Amino acid sequence: SPAYRQAWIALALILPISGFVMYYLWGRSSRNKKKLDQHILRQISYGNQFLIHDEQAYQKFLQENPVAGRMVKYMETAEFPLSAANDVKYYPMGEDAFEDIFAALEQAEDYILIDFFIVAEGALWDKTFEILKRKVAQGVEVKFLYDDFGAAIRTGKYFSTMLQKAGIDVRVFNPIHKYTGELYMNFRSHQKIVVVDGKVAFTGGFNLADEYANLIERFGVWKDTGVRVSGEAVWGLTIVFLQMWEASSTDPEHVGYLRYRVMPESTGDTYCHVISDGPANNPFNPIESIYNQMIMYSDEYLYITTPYLVIEDYMKQSLIEAAQRGVDVRIITPSIPDKKLVKILTYYNYGSLLKEGIRIYEYTPGFVHAKQILTEDAAIVGTINMDYRSYYLHYENGIWMSGEQIQEDIRKDFCATFEESHEVSYEEWKNRPRRYKFIEPVLNLFSILL
């Protein structure tokens, strides 16, 4: 992206030596990075051949939902097939999700697939590990995938070895090497997926760390959201997991995808697209386009929750145009941030949106880490932040859903969160502290790098 290049050029001009070092470490597209992209694309291409395209569900949805059908057509071309008759449960808090995740793990009889960005030692991990060890002893296959950067700081040096000794099949995505040229703080797997026996799967914004279930307090109440799915959408999440599993190894032998295929028994009423994306796809980034389409096709209301609001001008304009055509546009961000500089930049971005009638709320109980978007036609819940890093630099996943009950459940949570949040006015924004006004233009110059 031109903005990405311009940010690095500006940094190099302001900080000639350290700016170049930072670009060398994190900004460049090196030979090793290109090899990694090619390897990942091969695994994605291989896994895509196992996707199930339900032509009957596709045609039925197009007839019933002509507006949302435009998005469905796009997602079909992007290799995110539509599935019908899924049963979906929404979790308004991370602790609610983990309660059901543990229950599902306890019931596992065949296999467990787990993928998290952040893994941290603590009470949540201890309980997870205890269940996994017991399941391995019962003959259940357990595959555990995690991102090296996300887990490096909060797990022990021999974390991977500990899992292997327990009989868990473990892989690490994009290991951080001691060699400077291979240290990638970008290009991480930000995905979160749990699949049990091919019958039930979970995803959302939560990681495997105590704060995500409010077992410890870091930034007040930690609000995260997620979903549990049963039905054909489980197979979609299984494929995403297996694609990244194979991308995390140089083993030329593929896993047997069909070994994990279970015919769905769900009779739910929710249409789903399992969506995923990452830097190997650059410059074709379907998730960014799907988010923009959600904004553009909204007609009645558009509700968004994101911990970081760092978006490019074209998406700001899409939000403004939605408000101008009468859509009720509301955005929830944290009151207590986890990244102070990003918070200042997020607050700076309020201005042009508030001026055009978009309503912005800050979650006063603490930090909102949830990533979701809702319109009258559909919803997305997953790992995707509204920032450049999620759209271009990380591997992400989510579920696009269209169904009366799941949309109503998500809408109720939005409305409840509005009630316990502070609505920021345009006048309040204009009267923000002078120190913010001084630093904002500088931060905005490097917004894509934050």
Where are these regions (language model features)?
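N-terminal localization/anchoring segments of enzymes in phospholipid and broader phosphate metabolism
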Residues: 1-289, 293, 297, 337, ...
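Short, glycine-rich nucleotide/cofactor-binding loops
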Residues: 118-123, 304-312
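Helical hairpin unit composed of two closely spaced alpha helices linked by a short loop
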Residues: 298, 308-329, 334, 339
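Thr-Gly-centered strand-to-loop micro-motif
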Residues: 305-306, 363, 382
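Histidine/acidic-residue-rich catalytic or RNA/ligand-binding cores of hydrolases
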Residues: 314-316, 343-345, 374, 392
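A beta-strand-loop signature enriched in Asp, Gly, Thr, and Trp
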Residues: 325, 330-373
